[in-house]
Amino acid sequence: MFKPFGFAAETGSHLLTTQWLQLGNSLCLKERISIAMQVTFLAFFLIHLALKWFGVVRNRGSNDVEEDLKKQSITVKQSFSYNISLLCSVSILGTHCFILLLLFRDSVVSRCDSSVSVFSAEVSQSFSWLFVSVVVVKIRERRLVKFPWMLRSWWLCSFILSFSFDAHFITAKHEPLEFQDYADLTGLLASLFLLAVSIRGKTGFHLLESSGNTEPLLLGDQTEQNKKDSYSSSSPYGNATLFQRITFSWINPLFSLGYKRPLEKDDVPDIDVKDSARFCSHAFDQKLKTTKEKEGPGNAFFYNSVLRYVWRKAAINAVFAVVNASTAYIGPYLINDFVEFLSEKQSQSLNHGYLLALGFLTAKIVETVTQRQWIFGARQLGLRLRAALISHIYQKGLVLSSQSRQSHTSGEIINYMSVDVQRITDFIWYVNNIWMLPIQIFSAIYILQKHLGLGALAALVTTLMVMACNYPLTRLQRNYQSDIMNAKDDRMKATSEILKNMKILKLQAWDNQFLNKVKTLRKKEYDCLWKSLRLQAFTTFILWGAPSLISVVTFVTCMLMGVKLTAGAVLSALATFQMLQSPIFGLPDLLSALVQSKVSADRIASYLQQSETQKDAVEYCSKDHTELSVEIENGAFSWEPESSRPTLDDIELKVKSGMKVAVCGAVGSGKSSLLSSILGEIQKLKGTVRVSGKQAYVPQSPWILSGTIRDNILFGSMYESEKYERTVKACALIKDFELFSNGDLTEIGERGINMSGGQKQRIQIARAVYQNADIYLLDDPFSAVDAHTGRELFEDCLMGILKDKTVLYVTHQVEFLPAADLILVMQNGRVMQAGKFEELLKQNIGFEVLVGAHNEALDSILSIEKSSRNFKEGSKDDTASIAESLQTHCDSEHNISTENKKKEAKLVQDEETEKGVIGKEVYLAYLTTVKGGLLVPFIILAQSCFQMLQIASNYWMAWTAPPTAESIPKLGMGRILLVYALLAAGSSLCVLARTILVAIGGLSTAETFFSRMLCSIFRAPMSFFDSTPTGRILNRASTDQSVLDLEMAVKLGWCAFSIIQIVGTIFVMSQVAWQVCVIFIPVAVACVFYQRYYTPTARELSRMSGVERAPILHHFAESLAGATTIRAFDQRDRFISSNLVLIDSHSRPWFHVASAMEWLSFRLNLLSHFVFAFSLVLLVTLPEGVINPSIAGLGVTYGLSLNVLQATVIWNICNAENKMISVERILQYSKIPSEAPLVIDGHRPLDNWPNVGSIVFRDLQVRYAEHFPAVLKNITCEFPGGKKIGVVGRTGSGKSTLIQALFRIVEPSQGTIVIDNVDITKIGLHDLRSRLGIIPQDPALFDGTIRLNLDPLAQYTDHEIWEAIDKCQLGDVIRAKDERLDATVVENGENWSVGQRQLVCLGRVLLKKSNILVLDEATASVDSATDGVIQKIINQEFKDRTVVTIAHRIHTVIESDLVLVLSDGRIAEFDSPAKLLQREDSFFSKLIKEYSLRSNHFAGSNDLLS
């Protein structure tokens, strides 16, 4: 009992001192802490107020007018946050004032027996809350956008004080409740609301201007804030109130729309500005820069940058997580009191039971709110970090040096973006478990100590021992994860390279070889995955068995120490052990996530520290200060700085503005490297490079972006019709545009796959011209176009529209040299000669060799022409008529002629996405892949046995334990604990069986799916690769496959496990009170409704998220390939902005998927709380004796986890369905229509086929797709065996398509092709392609060695390989390398020149020695001298074999036995060169005449050379 306070009677200083000495009494502890806190707060507040007043006095009058104008034009619209904070503050103030009135009337309002303490506490509280209320009112007048930090700190401290003391006294004491208890409960609820407001921080004010526009109230930088607010104006989350954010009701409109119809991309709202990629990237960039300045390079700076970037949001999440972890243990803490209440119901008031039920319910609601907020906050933070990391990985990719690009291939970098970033952001979700874990453990130990005494020490020791076991397991898992990522990198690297060069593999019949290569790499990855999953299964067995082990050890210790195990104590302990399951069960996932994120973070940190292109390699000068456009002094450059021989040495170059500089030389002499030195792409070892003016660059290998032709030409510039028309005319593109279905708006496939080499070259030349640069660097711009088009480009573009510009152009075609102001002759990385054309010829040092080779070719043409007819020199009119005649033969690669203009055709098809519910066949396909689904029932059986044994063990302890300390147990404690231990051990073994079965089934299924998808992709026709971006395929091979490898089986397993668990929980609760089933039925119906209401929206959002991920990878792959061009055009910022837009496009559906999940979980949790509260009220209300208190306590124990289980069931089902989309996507690529069989048994050709080499085309018609017009039309002709056939025609006339039809890359839609009396459509593709040889137009080398690229099937000896290398003029180059045949070839052969790559391809056919050889522009990238040598070698090696040559160089085909002229996809002419030249009106004759006229000014060079 407590004494009356009697303030009137207690007087005198002695009495006052005595009262203050009594503050040590524990009943007055709250009052003592409260007084200290209020005094501290008031002191700080007064000091702060004084400082503010002093500042106002000093600045008085400076801003009075401005503030008055603001107040006159702006009115404030109050928000929910502000109103509730004011209401709560005033209500708490009123409560304390009322208590003061009661104290003056000598009323007993508290348990504290010190009247001075109580009075002082209430006075200080009243003053404090009075100040708080005044401050809140003043906030409105001051129009603050955020509550002051001091006020928010006070609200936080008040909540902690109320929660720590009030909740304890209300629930733990069994005396009648005082008025103070009810007042404290009211204050606790009000403090809870104020806590939420303080965490959010914002007042939510909106200002209403005189114009009527409503804008958020701003502080500081008004402009920047306005930008943010306008960005988030369309974001429901950004505009949501506090209540909407707590309940996630801001997403309701999206659910309403998604329930009515499938969502489209435009239906998804924008994300908040702070979640946007631009904001996140900028913020993270600031952290990186400041951290790197302080700490220098190393992985540590990356970790610290990430920490500084996330810490604010992470700290808020941590507060929610800590409160969540604390409130979760209130239930187990109260179970003993509840069992005692049920056991002694007659002596207890029902109010006390209801109050206990209210305590349970309040704790569960707080737990739900805080849990949902920290989980959502973690996902939101993960989204922000993902955006920041992807952005920086992309930005780094644009500036990587050549050495860094060699060590980090596209496949590896794509892995960083798709897998490593995902693992790091996933860890953000787990990171709160790090500080939740100790709180959960020590809360559990505290509860155990309260009920079991020193037995709790055994629980603590056992728990720490179990966790200590994880240390070696974690280290081992980390090694496995590192191995997995390295193996995945190797697989993705190979896959990316293969997809880019799939056409080469099919032409060479190497697809099976490279398929086996990927399978071998996958086998290595599979072995690493199996080791990891096997270890994870063992770890799960240990940790899932840990709660049972801890409970057995604890109970045995209690028995040995004589601690009485009553039913209440046992049930409280069991509930605590059950709560411990969450942190201990989650420990493997936490450790796995920690290990995976550590490995991934190290990889990204290492990547971000790779060397970049030299920023000081080039000095940029103003055009006003120098007459030189380009200047190099004493320059030395190298692609491999560590090499003893620089790539370029002793470079001296001065180029005046407006000069035309030609660069020529043999293959590998350093021509392209010279241009790279001007661009700053190659490492500068010494010297100075100065550039004055804007640059434009045209690379040797065309780089074309997916999109329209116009987009590629504009390249980010504004469209100006006159300028655009001049550009396309100068680049000879007008005819192509006229013949395309959509003109210049025709869509280009990935890497310009649907364009000829000449068209791609002219498009990128037009891109450079349109930029109106000062300096143009053109790397072999004429090699891919025919002679007529080359002349047009040179005259109209180089010498026409660019006549006043500075142009440096690399060329092998000597006819373009005389017009140059300066010619540079390169040899072995040095400028051996420099001067005008005539000057160089007179020097007789080496230039005459190049010119001589050209003249020899020209002489051969002239001699054939003269032998056919008397050659007459044409006049200017003749030249004009020839050009006009040639123009009439214009066509495009796909021959989309004018009559087909109306036929619209989209090359790159939109990604196929399913709509609506994921079909049952997808689930069945996944579940029945391994052994017809035989493992599934065994997995479910193992989990069912685990659940039954768990329930049996808990039921056994509840039934056998005595209800009170005085009761006699039904059995001896030794027997009780022995049975319990056996049941617990059995349940642990079931867990082991389940985890192993899930690991085996999941990984085997993933492997089967991967094999099917891989084989399906390799067997797909080329049309699939033409219309499918590489990034889209890689997305399935990386991200989706990773889901199948590590997540899918676990997610589906948890669906079954959680359903089994909730069925067990309902069973136990119904055993206690069957009436629970009555309320559970409608609640279950409501849950099902919510799930069905949620699923359509979440499913479509997940699909969108998966689809929107691929464009990020595709854009990145394209940007990496064209990084040099992007830097040369100074377009980095534009491409970075495009990347940020793509990230936001993916973040929008992803963010709303996460929000939708929390929306559902919040509502399901509330429904489960309703069931639990109903159960508690029912147990309190039922008369004594109706139920066994121990069994009732067991029901409450299980009921505590009902909310988690109920939400887990729906959450797991929805999450599994979202993950099942990856299965659906992989299944799509497992059913790609296949090309023809590789081998057809019964229709195999003879081993020596083709022995003659005759090729007959009969009424051949080819189209690339059903919706495309015909490309080749009615081709009928015969190539006799052993003859040399030349195929000519203007760029895009269908020459390459004819070759593709010959190799069946594209199947004939009509007609046949017969080789040596064998219809090629009747035999297998490998039997056809392996017997033919080809040197393709685009030379491709694979990552590896020279030996691997020449002989990938390992069929030839070193002697044979060296013989082929010498013949293709690469012997000296390869012998100069230390590794020789094992010399390194990096991705795409980037460390070899284009000409050298083409020579390697020549070496392949020399080794193969096929009876039919196809040369598709085989020597386009080599100089005339080398071309002449190669032609002689081919004539010698294949003199009795059929050689089909496609070439733009006339001398290459002039000596052919027959010439086929194609025009408009039809045969224009087909005869011997001599007969065609006899006809003056023949296309071939006019082509020769035009070439002769263009080269006529070389006639005098023979005299100079003689």
From Swiss-Prot:
Sequence intervals crossing the membrane: 37-57, 84-104, 116-136, 150-170, 179-199, 315-335, 350-370, 427-447, 452-472, 541-561, 567-587, 934-956, 976-996, 1048-1068, 1167-1187, 1191-1211
BP-aspect Gene Ontology terms: response to nematode
Residues given in the record as ATP 1 binding sites: 665-672
The EC number(s) this enzyme carries: 7.6.2.2
GO molecular function: ABC-type xenobiotic transporter activity; ATP binding; ATP hydrolysis activity; ATPase-coupled transmembrane transporter activity
CDD domains: ABC_6TM_ABCC_D1, ABC_6TM_ABCC_D2, ABCC_MRP_domain1, ABCC_MRP_domain2
Keywords: ATP-binding, Membrane, Nucleotide-binding, Repeat, Translocase, Transmembrane, Transmembrane helix, Transport
Pfam families according to UniProt: ABC_membrane, ABC_tran
Compartmental location: Membrane
Reactions catalysed according to its record: ATP + H2O + xenobioticSide 1 = ADP + phosphate + xenobioticSide 2
ABC transmembrane type-1 domain residues: 314-596, 936-1218
Topological type in the membrane: Multi-pass membrane protein
Taxonomy, superkingdom: Eukaryota
Tissue spec. comment: Ubiquitous.
Uppermost EC category: translocase
GO CC terms, sorted: membrane; plasmodesma
Presence of keyword rRNA-binding: no
Annotated residues for binding of ATP 2: 1289-1296
Residue span, ABC transporter domain: 630-853, 1257-1489
Similarity comment text for this entry: Belongs to the ABC transporter superfamily. ABCC family. Conjugate transporter (TC 3.A.1.208) subfamily.
Function: Pump for glutathione S-conjugates.
Protein name as annotated: ABC transporter C family member 9
Annotated source species: Arabidopsis thaliana (Mouse-ear cress)
Taxonomy of the source species: Eukaryota, Viridiplantae, Streptophyta, Embryophyta, Tracheophyta
Gene that specifies this protein: ABCC9
